[in-house]
């Protein structure tokens, strides 16, 4: 009987209910905030890959116009140097660049290369089961044919 009277008394008590409700909702709210931040960072990193590829394409094209013919390894190294440089500051361990001569040459008087970049993006959401993300971007590079 004593037990039921204590439960009846607690049922009408509202002090501390806010902290209990916050304790129940806080993990969800924090996960949503971290998720929103994570999506924003992933979008920024994807746009960085696009900008790096464009900047590398311009650099390689200008080098060819100066009669400095770069091989695919030099093109990849130049792209990595741009990626880890001041504007983008991507981790060199997480960036991979592959430059290959395209199988089908679409433009007469030019050589077409395919620049493919992959980036292992950092993941801050492993605590809620989000898997690691690898971002990838590919674009053609056209240089004057010699």
Task: Indicate residue ranges for each PLM-predicted region.
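Short, conserved structural patches
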Residues: 2, 54-146
């Amino acid at each position: 009987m004593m037990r039921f009277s204590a439960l009846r008394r607690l049922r009408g008590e509202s002090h501390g209910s806010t902290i209990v409700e916050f304790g129940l909702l806080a993990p969800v709210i924090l996960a949503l905030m971290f998720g929103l931040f994570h999506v924003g960072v992933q979008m920024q990193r994807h746009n960085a890959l696009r900008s790096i590829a464009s900047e590398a394409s311009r650099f390689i094209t200008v080098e060819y116009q100066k009669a400095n013919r770069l091989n695919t390894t030099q093109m990849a190294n130049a792209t990595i140097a741009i990626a880890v440089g001041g504007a983008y500051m991507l981790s060199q361990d997480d960036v991979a660049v592959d430059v290959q001569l395209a199988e089908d040459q679409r433009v007469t008087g030019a050589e077409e290369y395919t620049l493919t970049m992959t980036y292992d993006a950092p993941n801050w959401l492993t605590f809620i089961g989000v898997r690691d993300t690898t971002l990838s971007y590919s674009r053609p590079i056209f240089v004057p044919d010699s």
